[in-house]
Amino acid sequence: MKRLASCLMAIGVLAGGASQASGIRVAGVDHVGINVPDLKQAEAFFGSAFGCEPVTRIGPFQLDPAASADAAGFAPRADSVTIAMLRCAEGSNIELFEYRNPHGNKDMPRAEDIGASHIAFYTDDIGGAVSYLKANGITVLGEPVKMTSGDTEGETWVHFRSPWGSDMELVSYPNGKGYERRSSLRLWNPKHPGQ
């Protein structure tokens, strides 16, 4: 019986790349949602910098600040919300929310704050991408960092601030990453989305 279980486990490991032992079976990340102060500015930025294209737009929806929490547990503090969905190459979509909100917190979360997040865009030409951002008035936070050892060896990354102040990242690993030499399991790669 132990031998049968071992054989079945080996077949399972050999049969597929990323497997899910339990839980919800997902095909991937559908979208990343970002709150922005100006929807048109954000659409223009993602379009000109990364080639993202607007696909859908809904709203503005009037919100009732006196209403009780909705099914998602949110009690609206904003007056209205408009939502746009962008298609970004072969990766995840980006969902943009523009809340009209005189009461909301305008401070950006810092990297160490709970709830802080960032989105990373893959490019084979990180130097060219950094030059483009700088030429277009985008604040790049330091110089690209090249990882020279460990699981992320071969990866280069740099963070930048969007026009509205969100932390974002450029990442590049055209020749792969260090972990690939020791593991058959692969992280999703936008250059090879089906692998």
Go through each PLM region and give its residues.
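Positively charged n-region of N-terminal signal peptides that target proteins for export
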Residues: 1-4
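Bacterial N-terminal signal peptides
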Residues: 6-16
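A short acidic/small-residue loop/turn micro-motif
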Residues: 62, 101, 174-176
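A short, polar/proline- and glycine-enriched secondary-structure boundary/capping micro-motif
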Residues: 105-109, 179-182
